[in-house]
A protein has these predicted regions:
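Conserved phosphate/anionic-ligand binding catalytic regions in large, soluble enzymes, centered on
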Residues: 31-39, 80, 184-206, 305-317, ...
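Gly-rich Lys/Arg/Thr-decorated short loops/hinges at beta-loop-alpha junctions or inter-strand turns
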Residues: 150-166, 218-230, 333-338, 380-385, ...
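C-terminal accessory/binding modules appended to enzymatic or scaffolding proteins
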Residues: 375-387, 393-395, 399, 557-601, ...
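Iron-sulfur cluster-binding cysteine motifs and their immediate structural context
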Residues: 81-87, 485-491, 579-598, 609-623
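Hydrophobic alpha-helical positions that pack around
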Residues: 140, 269-395, 407
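Short amphipathic, charge-patterned alpha-helical segments
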Residues: 244-246, 396-411
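Flexible inter-domain linker/hinge segments
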Residues: 120-186, 340, 346-361
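Ferredoxin-type iron-sulfur electron-transfer modules in oxidoreductases and energy-metabolism complexes
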Residues: 2-25, 41-70, 83, 88-121, ...
Length: 623
């Protein structure tokens, strides 16, 4: 059935909601990449099989056999605790669900309405039966992620049921293209891909170009290590992003659009394709959308995983079939982008904000966040923290609130050391900056960038020199090689960092690192190259004493840098079992059975096999 008007859309919404209400229970199995990796597909298959038996009247426990729906949702947020499951209408949130739990869930929850309490989340000693009871979830403000984990990620009907495509109907029915641009501009929405450029201003620049062939492009590449926000949106609610892109196309007069998504996101690609096909089937994409005479065709382009293709001009070059390399600007993509035509280029999260802005209004959007950065921001919260996962909070939220109130604090009570924000192009923030607001302008003042939204929390067991080396290794390998400052500068910086972590550094290396970092930052061709030295700049500024210890004292206080570690055996704890010696690949451990063993550090290759295999904590490390 093709939807040709707002009335058709509302009728479809009512029809689908009636179908959903007919279910006695709905089993929402998290089927995001994280939960699938921990076995969610088996959970889904088992629940579907068991619930089919219920509907097939093979269950004799009660006369009124329940009508049960089992659906695959997007990410439910608590990624570390997967596989996750929610049961409606009871609103139970189950964590760490295993296939063997499914029978009990059916028998107790679906048939009797009683919870399986051992599967509830626990916040210390507090049992949290419902999502709203869980601090990780109840302290978020979800706009972009509002449907993720709540609707079938592969059903456009369920998106329509929660109000999907009503913003598009409003735009097509009662707003001119300029009115759409004005509303987005008034909202203050800034691009969520890292730079924070005002979305409305970008759309306006494309709309006023003389060239009438225009494109709308979505950057779904998300190349930062540890970042999974955009991927989760594409997996869990691709329709919202597509609706936002369609509204953008109407606003700027584009008839074709491209979603650039990395090949390492196969689930995102699969669900995007399904979403596009379903939208075309319902007349919400393609020719004559909502019988308005407006055409917009959407295509998927799979990238090869190059980090540099997150940069606008490199991304458009890749779509064109060329090598993904940034070019000198101007002209910018709004003037000459894809195939030399004016192009709107925003990321997944930016487009996903648009439908809500159109429906609720720019003034509503500005009540959330800060004056200079309205709205919310999604973050992937990872590292040494109790609760890792996907979060969405108002702009201006402090790191302290995110780490301690939402994330539950650091693991095992370890002391906080720093948090890396913005991935390999970002910087490291420290204890004194925990109360700084997270918005584009405030973070920039701290020698970091918001980036796409990766937050890696680090404790006292993290070596900041190694962190800088890790990120520099990434950016150096991902450099496209076009400009000398980035190609050669990052290579030289990496050589120095590797020398320092190997205990071969000199004090003069620190001055050279700073000089190189400033050179790359000021002279690299593209934004990715200019931001590549930020992890080095921020760690040198805030943890210079650690660099000096590595050089002067040949010491790594976190006991992370392999070359600066020494393994020893405590004779008081060693029972002489010989297990360490058997597992030592270098033959560096000697001794007699039932007598304390000894490690020869001249032979030891510092692999740590002895420590890993000792059951009595007799092996210890000195830095």
């Amino acid at each position: 059935m093709s939807i040709k008007s707002k009335e058709d859309l509302l009728n479809k919404q009512a029809e689908v909601n009636e179908q959903i209400k007919s279910y006695t229970c709905r089993v929402l199995v998290c089927s995001g990449t994280g939960c699938i990796a921990s076995g969610a597909q088996k959970i889904y298959d088992e629940m579907a099989t068991l619930c089919e038996r219920i509907d097939g009247v093979t269950v004799e426990m009660q006369k009124d056999v329940p009508h049960v729906g089992v659906v695959k949702t997007g990410c439910q947020g608590l990624c570390e605790l997967g596989p996750l499951m929610r049961i409606e209408p009871y609103d139970y949130q189950y964590v760490h669900v295993q296939p063997e739990d499914c029978k009990e869930i059916v028998e107790r929850t679906i048939l009797e309405g009683k919870p399986v309490e051992r599967l509830f989340y626990r916040d210390n000693d507090t049992v949290c039966p419902h999502p709203d009871d869980i601090p990780f979830l109840n302290q978020q403000t979800r706009i972009v992620l509002e449907n993720c984990g709540k609707i079938d990620a592969e059903s456009i009907e369920e998106y329509i049921a929660v109000g999907g495509y009503q913003a598009l109907a409003k735009v097509m029915g009662s707003m001119s293209p300029q009115e759409v641009i004005d509303e987005v501009t008034k909202s203050g929405l800034r691009g969520r891909g890292g730079a924070g450029f005002p979305a409305g201003k970008k759309w306006s620049q494309v709309a006023r170009q003389a060239e009438k062939t225009r494109y709308v492009v979505c950057n779904g590449d998300e190349g930062d290590p540890g970042a999974f926000m955009d991927g989760s949106v594409m997996e869990g609610d691709p329709y919202k992003m597509i609706e936002g892109m369609t509204i953008a196309a109407y606003a700027v007069g584009a008839e074709n659009g491209y979603i650039y998504v990395r090949a390492e996101y196969p689930l995102s690609v699969k669900r995007l394709r399904m979403a596009i096909e379903q939208a075309e089937k319902y007349g919400l994409l393609g020719d004559n959308i909502l019988n308005s005479g407006v055409n917009f065709h959407l295509h998927i382009n799979r990238g090869a995983g190059a980090f540099v293709c997150g940069e606008g001009s490199a991304l458009t070059a890749s779509i064109e079939g060329n090598r993904g390399m940034p070019r000198v600007k101007p002209p910018r993509t709004v003037e000459k982008g894809l195939w030399g035509k004016p192009t709107v280029l925003n990321n997944v999260e930016t487009y996903a904000n648009v439908p809500k802005i159109i429906l609720q209004g720019a003034d509503w959007f500005r009540t959330i966040g800060t004056e200079g950065s309205p709205g919310t921001k999604t973050f992937s919260l990872t590292g040494s923290i109790e609760n890792t996962g996907l979060i969405e909070v108002p702009m201006g939220t402090t790191l302290r609130h995110i780490i301690y109130d939402i994330g539950g604090g650091l693991k095992s009570g370890a002391a906080f050391k720093g948090v890396q924000i913005g991935g390999p192009s970002g910087g490291c923030l420290i204890l004194d900056q925990l109360d700084a607001p997270l918005d584009f302008d405030s973070v920039k003042k701290l020698d970091a960038i918001m980036g796409s939204g990766g937050l890696v929390v680090m404790d006292e067991n993290t070596c900041m020199v190694e962190v800088a080396r890790f990120f520099m290794n990434f950016t150096q390998r991902e450099s496209c090689g076009k400009c000398v400052p980035c190609r050669e500068g990052t290579k030289r910086m990496l050589e120095i960092l590797e020398r320092i972590v190997d205990g071969k550094g000199e004090m003069s290396d620190l001055d050279e690192l700073e000089e190189l970092a400033n050179m790359v930052q000021n002279m690299a061709l593209c934004g990715l190259g200019k931001s590549a030295p930020l992890p080095v700049i921020s760690t040198l500024k805030r943890f210079r004493d650690e660099y000096e210890e590595h050089i002067r004292d040949k010491k790594c206080r976190a006991k992370v840098c392999t070359a600066l570690r020494q393994f020893h055996i405590n004779p008081e704890f060693c029972i002489g079992c010989g297990k360490c010696a058997k597992n030592c690949p270098a033959g560096a451990i000697s001794g007699k059975i039932k007598h304390p063993y000894h490690i020869d550090n001249d032979i030891c290759i510092k692999c740590g096999a002895c420590k890993d295999n000792c059951n009595f904590d007799a092996v210890y490390v000195e830095a």
